[in-house]
Amino acid sequence: MATVRICVCGDESTGKSSLIASLVKDQFVNNKIQPVLPQITIPPSIGTPENVSTTIVDTSARPQDRTTLRKEIRKCNVILLVYADHYSYERVALFWMPYFRSLGVNVPVVLCANKSDLVGQGTTPQVVEEELLPVMAEFREVDSCIRTSARDHRNVNEVFFLCQKAVTHPIAPLFDYKEGHLKPLCINALKRIFYLCDKDQDGYLNEQEMRDFQARCFDKPLTTDDLDNIKLSIAKSLPASDLEKGIDLPGFLQLNKLYAEKGRHETIWIILRKFHYTDSLSLEDKFIRPKFEVPEYSSAELSPAGYRFFVDLFLIFDKDNDGGLNDEELEALFAPAPGLPSSWTDSSFPSSTVRNEAGHVTLQGWLAQWSMTTFIEPKTTIEYLAYLGFEPSNPKDSITAALKITKPRKRRSRLGRVERNVVLCYVLGASGAGKSALLDSFLNRPFYGLYHPTIKPRRAVNSVELPGGKQVYLILEELGELEPAILENRAKLDACDLICYAYDSSDPDSFSHIVDLRKKYPHLDELPSIYTALKADKDKTNQRCELQPDQYTSSLSMSLPLHVSVTWGSISELFVAYADAATTPSTAFPRSNEEGPDRTSLYIALGATACAGVAALTIWRRATNAL
């Protein structure tokens, strides 16, 4: 916010214009001033909240000026409502506050008891108790109240500072004065902040964690005396607190409640804004959704910093050290986020990744799941990195430092290995071919033999070690009833690294589905592919199609189908073959007999010959010149 616009309202002769003049002149103006002062703008100075400019608009309460008054009230950020005697005080509740509500404005109101220099006005505690607090209790939009005197120049600067602070650090979203407690949204935000600062997740902010919190929020060290005073304040309100271990969540919330009760709500706002909260107590959109675009033919992956963050997160929340995250540990881990990512719920997490015998997500499965999420929905990963507290090593970097963009692989047929650590393979085939069992086997699940048709798309992700030792994450996706829509979607196919054509070698009608599929979608020829004969533990049968699978693949100058069974221990070699083909796509392309020869080597040879000829000519010319 660049400017705070203050609308000064109140009955006639309450001293509105005198307050403004006293602020500008820094003293009381004895000369008669005009009934309504022109609008003034004051630039920010030292101590101005959030370094904002301030525009002050004087108004008239006369009925003939009501149109202008309505217009100014609707344009302002805060209303300074001034009264000066019993009559104008009564009008605060009877006219002014209902009038503001009738206009539908939702701005804070600062209530000002002016002309405190006059005899018979009472003491400040008496005025606060008898006049100001009842109005604040009745009208929640009243942010604060103060006694002033333009003649004595008493609290003149302070009243306008309160107006500025009511906009830059509003109390209304934080604290309910009537009920005397922090509001739910504020509590939720502070709970998340506590969670992020409790680095060891023991339920307490220890001395070092408090010092780190102080440095982050207030850019100054926390002395031992300061920490002792904080603990003393908490102990007075919560005598049962165990402050020897540190400050627990109830103590942290109580501390912030004390700030609100003492009018130090700007302290709470400093904390909230350091953790990227807006005035509506939601996280800043630019924080959880920073700009991040994946160029065409490229993909997104976790960077080393991103993997390190998720490894650390796993180790912290695996409280029982059993090597897996159970439901309670996952719930605690995702406490500062709005639950699991919706894509995880849709894919029936954790069944989409690696689990141990107890059904708990292993570290391998945890990293594989995030690798898949980053590949398919990088913006979801970025959003959850923000929720879960990722902090880049360089303060100038954004959360996107946890991700990296791969080199584009526009020409899949180019020789060599693509620089990708996460690859996607679509598993296509007839119903009952064994695709679901293949995905289960990929996740080390036992084979049950019961057939359940796949309706929704299903994914499985796991790490695979390539020949040479490099590890990649392989995503196998069974398309279900969305198969036609996905195979017609060029963007979906561009994201795919490999097609696995799977058929049941014991079913005579299984392979014809693949033949028909390739005829229906000829653009599938543009993708690298592998043919897989599943259920090889059963008796092999001839397929009812023009060419048998071996003949069909040979006619395409491709490798013969890989014969495997999910009941065999060697099934893991199949997934290595998939990952290897996905990362070296030139080895898995169909080539028809009509396709011309690969002239790459010829072009290289001709280029070398031409370079040699130019060099020889240059040497001959130099030799001739030398003669």
Swiss-Prot record:
Its source organism is: Gibberella zeae (strain ATCC MYA-4620 / CBS 123657 / FGSC 9075 / NRRL 31084 / PH-1) (Wheat head blight fungus)
**The protein's name:** Mitochondrial Rho GTPase 1
Q: Name one GO cellular component term.
A: mitochondrial outer membrane
**Topology class, membrane:** Single-pass type IV membrane protein
Residues binding GTP 1, per UniProt: 10-17, 58-62, 114-117
**Which stretches make up the Miro domain?**
1-169, 420-584
Transmembrane residue ranges: 600-620
Primary gene name: GEM1
Q: Which residues bind GTP 2?
A: 429-436, 465-469, 534-537
List keywords of the entry alphabetically. Answer: Calcium, GTP-binding, Hydrolase, Membrane, Metal-binding, Mitochondrion, Mitochondrion outer membrane, Nucleotide-binding, Repeat, Transmembrane, Transmembrane helix
Query: Pfam families, alphabetically?
Result: EF_assoc_1, EF_assoc_2, Ras
List all topological domains (Cytoplasmic): 1-599
